[in-house]
Amino acid sequence: MDISKKTNLTMLCDYYELTMGNGYFVQGMQDCITYFDIFFRSVPDNGGFAIAAGLEQAIEYISQLHFDEADIEYLRGRKMFDEGFLDYLRNFRFTGDIWAVPEGTPIMTVRAPAIQAQLVETFLLLTLNHQSLIATKANRVTRAAKGRTVLEFGSRRAQGVDAAVDGARAAYIGGCKGTACTLTDQLYGVPAGGTMAHSWVQMFPSEYDAFKAYCETYPDNPTLLVDTYNTLKSGIPNAIRVFNEVLKPRGLTKCGIRLDSGDMTYLTKKARKMLDAAGWQSCKISCSNSLDEYIIEDILNQGAQIDLFGVGERLITAKSEAVFGGVYKLIAIEDAEGN
């Protein structure tokens, strides 16, 4: 993703980065080489580990840093900034060095002139804090799933566009196998997927008609949402009927059902028995509906028969621990000899 084509994010910084930068310039300290470390003080959910993410966006941002004339005029209008400093910003480019752990590992040192090092603080922290939080949460969720597939389903509950798109990317780094967010697939290559909502079922004269139309449209590995009306009395029986009528004559065996409500342990146990008895041992069972690592672990311990989890709001918002807590701290200043 080319950030410069989306928007100029150079001004996405805390105001004091600019006032400190102006002060450094006035004091003749703009070329003083500094070192800043990004680190965090505690891991989310007392989980024992954290996953670093957000490096790609951080590097993109830094490589595109520049102040345009609109930015310069805005700052001039604040009547706080030295004209020499504004000229400095007009020609601003980041020339520092950055060391970071690779994304997806259990964070970053910036070496740059003081003004440059201050100006990048806000974006680096907001990006690394957010994506590391989501990647860590995703890893906890996927560990709880014990090898079963986990997909990120949270866009509609995310706290803004970037939280949805970049959060899905971070979830992929953390261990999710794909996302429901199409834009994340388009921009970053994270596999997008999805099937149907309850509205699809409601659009047809009957649940059977809805399932039949879907399987005829997408016969290769369709997944049917079976809980719109009654999971055990109509949803699963109608799914089996349609699998027999549409898939079986074509020699197709890959298919699935999804539950989005109810007692997941009880319903999936019943569903597995019904599908197996009908000869559809190949049918996968998916579940969604406000899941997280705690619920997943609990229902699996109860014997739930689930092959795939769709995890949404509690992953994309990291609901149980909503702040990562990374900080950006000055750790060293180079002297004239480079020491």
Q: Over which residues does each language-model region extend?
A:
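Ordered alpha/beta subdomains of enzyme catalytic regions
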Residues: 1-220, 246-248, 329-339
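Glycine-rich phosphate/ribose-binding loops and adjacent secondary-structure elements
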Residues: 195, 199-339
